[in-house]
């Protein structure tokens, strides 16, 4: 209740009186713009605040009434939209089941997979809205025949005759050649000159991948920092007490046995995580300096071994890609086409297993083990994709190589007339191969292993058991597929559609594998820190995809034979041309100034000011949080002072008093004390216990509080009446 305290008590000097605090709080609530509905007070207090804000007889302005009505309508619409979104949410029931049976750590993987599906659908919607629909609706003029280039390519390779017998429709689909002349690849997009069209398809095609990357970056960053404000308010080392979880975890609205079983598993997993973290914290506190030094040296040894594995994997991928691109005339041409994806898949299959084995040797905490394994797996995967991109650049774009066919046209025109399509086909094959590997591993490895383990008995089968569902490895697979999709946004604009289908099917495949064929980890972990690392890994993949794309768009010559930018030295050259055609001289000068070095100095000063303001605001928020914590502690102590004053002022019941009729009716609603005579948690320090019902033994009177000896019986003070007395 927001009522002033009428009982005075001893107070330290400098502490304001309760009446002053109450008046200040009333004044703050009166002038605050926070809706009364959102205030953390009882209904009686909210009515009082409402009367303070709108006294009786005072007519509010029409604008204020309209504003209040609009806020109410917006709030109701927002709540209705949130309820509708929760009701129509994708895989809500499946996520609830997985979280209850296997814990929030494994559930975070499936939630992350759903988030990636949403990102791909948004990217597809952006590309279809700004590129595909205008291209179909406006029907831009035909650019005419392509340039007839006379190529001088000594010793150029031709397709080997033995390859023709393998060219069936299935192989064309797997390699992407069946879709070469469709909108799946870059080469099928053709328009006329910019001056002959109202809507610039070239500019839309150029900016759509950049907008998709920016949209994915903002969504990932928002999801990453989603829990940081709550973590800042609660503190770094905050943990909810086990007593609160024991008494408040159960949902009493459950009426179905299956839901009750899932809820029991969920509570059990939460307690396992809490107890495991507490046990490890105690072990860390008991270690000596020598044990700590040995532990750090073992950590260093494991990380060095993991680094050597990454270097070896990168070397294997580089030589496999180089051999595949340099030996196209051999009879094994079809197998060599899938040699780089095969080596990358083999590395990504063996790497997480080795990393998990090495990390588990050091007995890390579960969260640290998952995050460290995930970091090394991501380093391996992103490094392999980076090396794959570098090797393609050396072969197709002659980056770092001296080749005569690259001097005149800027790329290896003898072997790759439309090099954007070639790069798109490589990324298409990589995406297809990753999904096929996921399907094959689920139904050709995990399923037979489960059937054999369930069918036979013995030491070997007991040792083999079901496969453990490794979260780092599964996260690595979907992050790798998403990174490949981002890398192919320019060369294969509809690759997000393909990846969306793969992610949708992957969810059900992984769910079946988890529920039927796998076993959960015996060491559960929290979802909070793992979710943060998932988003961090995704940002690293986004950075890996954005750097090559920016380099290609700004510096690499486009193909002379296909695509939208055949007459441009680089795709970005279309932007200055459109600026010169569509903007007045003032706008051109303004854009030229924004892109010049002279604008960098005021931009740097402005960013410095913004950064200073943000840092200052962060520090002010931290100080405010510290003050609010102290105020909360003071309020708890103030309530205990009120209880002490009340216990001193109320009369003690005499020995002849009988319970029931002699107590006034107002005492019937008096709360019971959960710890009569003992200092309860949150009380201001240790005080002499108030004796309640005690146990008498041979030694005399005992205190009801554990570990404390009672006072004489004559020192009895007032205590709250028990339930039997009431």
From Swiss-Prot:
What GO cellular component is one of the record's annotations? Golgi membrane
Q: Name one GO biological process term.
A: negative regulation of protein binding
Where is it expressed, tissue-wise?
Expressed in placenta, prostate and testis.
What transmembrane ranges does the database entry give?
115-135, 201-221, 300-320, 339-359, 427-447, 489-509, 532-552, 595-615
Residue numbers of Phosphoserine PTMs:
6, 658, 673
Q: Which residues lie on this side of the membrane: Cytoplasmic?
A: 1-114, 222-299, 360-426, 510-531, 616-726
Compositionally biased spans, kind Pro residues: 652-662
Domain comment quoted from the record: The TMC domain mediates the interaction with SLC30A1/ZNT1.
Quaternary structure, from the entry: Interacts with TMC6. Interacts and forms a complex with TMC6 and CIB1; the interaction stabilizes each component of the complex. Interacts and forms a complex with TMC6 and SLC30A1/ZNT1; the interaction regulates zinc transport into the ER. Interacts with TRADD; the interaction competes with TRADD/RIPK1/TRAF2/cIAPs complex I formation and facilites complex II formation. (Microbial infection) Interacts with human papillomavirus 16/HPV16 protein E5; the interaction alleviates TMC8-mediated transcription factors inhibition.
Associated clinical condition: Epidermodysplasia verruciformis 2: A form of epidermodysplasia verruciformis, a rare genodermatosis associated with a high risk of skin carcinoma that results from an abnormal susceptibility to infection by specific human papillomaviruses, including the oncogenic HPV5. Infection leads to the early development of disseminated flat wart-like and pityriasis versicolor-like skin lesions. Cutaneous Bowen's carcinomas in situ and invasive squamous cell carcinomas develop in about half of the patients, mainly on sun-exposed skin areas. EV2 inheritance is autosomal recessive.
Stated name of the protein: Transmembrane channel-like protein 8
Q: Which organism is it from?
A: Homo sapiens (Human)
């Amino acid at each position: 209740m927001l009522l002033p305290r009428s009982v005075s008590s001893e107070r330290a000097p400098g502490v304001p009186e309760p009446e002053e605090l109450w008046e200040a709080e009333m004044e703050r609530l009166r002038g605050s713009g926070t809706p009364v509905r959102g205030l953390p007070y009882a209904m009686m207090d909210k009515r009082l605040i409402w009367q303070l804000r709108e006294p009786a007889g005072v007519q509010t302005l029409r604008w204020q009434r309209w504003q209040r009505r609009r806020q109410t309508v917006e709030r109701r619409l927002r709540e209705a939209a949130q309820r509708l979104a929760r009701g129509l949410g994708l895989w809500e029931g499946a996520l609830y089941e997985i979280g209850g049976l296997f814990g929030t750590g494994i559930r975070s993987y499936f939630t992350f997979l759903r988030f990636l599906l949403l990102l791909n659908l948004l990217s597809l919607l952006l590309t279809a809205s700004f590129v595909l629909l205008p291209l179909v609706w406006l029907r831009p003029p035909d650019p005419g025949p392509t340039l007839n280039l006379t190529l001088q390519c000594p010793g150029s390779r031709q397709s080997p005759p033995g390859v023709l017998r393998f060219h069936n429709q299935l192989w064309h689909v797997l390699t992407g050649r069946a879709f070469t002349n469709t909108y799946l690849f870059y080469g099928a997009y053709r328009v006329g000159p910019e001056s002959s069209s109202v809507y610039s398809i070239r500019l839309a095609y150029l900016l759509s991948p950049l907008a998709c990357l920016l949209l994915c970056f903002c969504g990932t960053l928002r999801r990453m920092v989603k829990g940081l404000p709550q973590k800042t308010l609660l503190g770094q080392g905050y943990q909810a007490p086990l007593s609160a979880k024991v008494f408040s975890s159960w949902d009493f609205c459950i009426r179905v046995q299956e839901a009750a079983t899932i809820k029991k598993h969920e509570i059990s997993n939460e307690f396992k995580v809490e107890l495991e973290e507490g046990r490890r914290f105690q072990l860390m506190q008991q270690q000596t300096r020598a044990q700590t030094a040995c532990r750090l040296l073992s950590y260093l040894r494991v990380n060095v071994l993991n680094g050597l594995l990454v270097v070896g994997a990168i070397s294997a991928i580089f030589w496999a890609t180089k051999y595949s691109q340099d030996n196209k005339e051999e009879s094994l041409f079809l197998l060599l086409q899938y040699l780089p994806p095969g080596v990358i898949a083999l590395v990504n299959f063996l790497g997480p297993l080795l990393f998990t084995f090495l990390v588990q040797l050091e007995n890390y905490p579960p969260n640290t083990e998952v995050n460290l394994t995930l970091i090394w797996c991501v380093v391996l995967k992103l490094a392999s994709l980076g090396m794959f991109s570098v090797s393609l650049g050396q072969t197709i774009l002659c980056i770092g190589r001296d080749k005569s066919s690259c001097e005149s046209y800027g790329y290896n025109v003898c072997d790759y007339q439309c090099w954007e399509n070639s790069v798109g086909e490589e990324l298409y094959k990589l995406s297809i191969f990753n999904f096929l590997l996921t399907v094959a591993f689920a139904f050709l490895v995990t399923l037979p292993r489960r059937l054999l383990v369930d069918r036979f008995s013995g030491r070997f089968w007991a040792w083999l058991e079901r496969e453990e569902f490794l979260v780092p490895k599964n996260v690595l697979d979907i992050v790798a597929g998403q990174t490949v999709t981002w890398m192919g946004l320019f060369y294969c604009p509809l690759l997000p559609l393909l990846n969306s289908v793969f992610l949708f099917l992957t969810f059900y495949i992984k769910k079946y594998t988890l529920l039927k064929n796998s076993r959960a980890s015996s060491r559960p972990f929290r979802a909070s820190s793992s979710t943060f690392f998932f988003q961090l890994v995704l940002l690293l993949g986004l950075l890996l995809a954005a750097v090559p794309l920016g380099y290609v768009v700004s510096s690499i010559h486009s193909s002379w034979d296909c695509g939208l930018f055949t007459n441009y030295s680089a795709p970005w050259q279309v932007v200055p041309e459109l600026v010169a055609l569509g903007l007045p001289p003032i706008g051109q000068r303004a854009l030229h100034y924004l892109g010049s070095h002279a604008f960098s100095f005021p931009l740097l000063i402005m960013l410095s000011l913004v950064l200073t303001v943000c840092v200052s605001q962060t520090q002010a928020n931290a100080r405010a949080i510290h003050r609010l914590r102290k105020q909360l502690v003071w309020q708890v102590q103030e309530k205990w002072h009120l209880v002490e004053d009340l216990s001193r002022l109320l009369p003690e019941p005499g020995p002849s008093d009988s319970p029931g009729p002699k107590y006034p009716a107002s005492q019937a609603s008096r709360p019971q004390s959960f710890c009569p005579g003992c200092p309860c948690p949150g009380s201001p320090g240790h005080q002499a216990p108030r004796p309640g019902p005690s146990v008498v033994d041979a030694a005399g009177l005992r205190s009801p509080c554990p570990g404390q000896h009672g006072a004489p019986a004559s020192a009895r003070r007032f205590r709250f009446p028990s339930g039997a007395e009431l």
